[in-house]
């Protein structure tokens, strides 16, 4: 029997939470709340993003609770994950990710489920491979066993990435 996997991402523009069911291979929750940017502004300062994420955690928690009630409760959660940095590089840091990391750590500790911290960029790569595997019917796990090139567009960044299988037991791939 599979389980549920709960994930959080608090990027500079969106508060996100998702619950994935290993049994069905589908998401039972895909919660996203765009952070407000004042008209005429180009984006958010980190302090504004952190404050907006903190205000959004109540709605995200309610969406999680409702989804878990339908799924049979929180006992099925096998792991919790969060984006803890923009990229998997030394020194990669943005305060907005601390909100999701704190929420994930709290939920993980309360449920006794392991916590996995990944980068926001890693999340984009993984979900792109997952989505493509659903559309084009290929084995996503096998896909990560060979190097490939990925385009990453997020916020104000555009990068071409070389993604390779990880030699670490804690990671699926390295960028």
Task: Give residue spans per PLM region.
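Short acidic/glycine-rich loops and adjacent helix/strand connectors
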Residues: 1-175
């Amino acid at each position: 029997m599979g389980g549920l996997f709960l994930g959080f991402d608090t990027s500079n523009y969106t508060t996100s939470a998702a619950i994935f069911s290993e049994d069905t291979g589908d998401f039972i929750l895909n919660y996203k709340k765009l952070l407000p940017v004042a008209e005429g502004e180009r984006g958010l300062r980190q302090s504004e993003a952190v404050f907006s994420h903190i205000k959004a955690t109540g709605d995200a928690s309610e969406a999680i609770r409702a989804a878990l009630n339908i799924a049979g409760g929180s006992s099925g959660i096998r792991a919790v994950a969060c984006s803890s940095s923009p990229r998997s590089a030394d020194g990669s840091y943005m305060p907005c990710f601390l909100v999701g990391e704190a929420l994930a750590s709290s939920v993980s500790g309360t449920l006794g489920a392991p916590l996995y911290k990944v980068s926001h960029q890693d999340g984009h790569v993984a979900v792109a491979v997952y989505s493509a595997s659903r559309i084009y019917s290929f084995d996503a796990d096998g896909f990560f066993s060979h190097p490939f090139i990925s385009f990453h567009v997020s916020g104000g960044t555009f990068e071409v990435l070389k993604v390779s299988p990880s030699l670490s037991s804690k990671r699926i791939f390295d960028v």
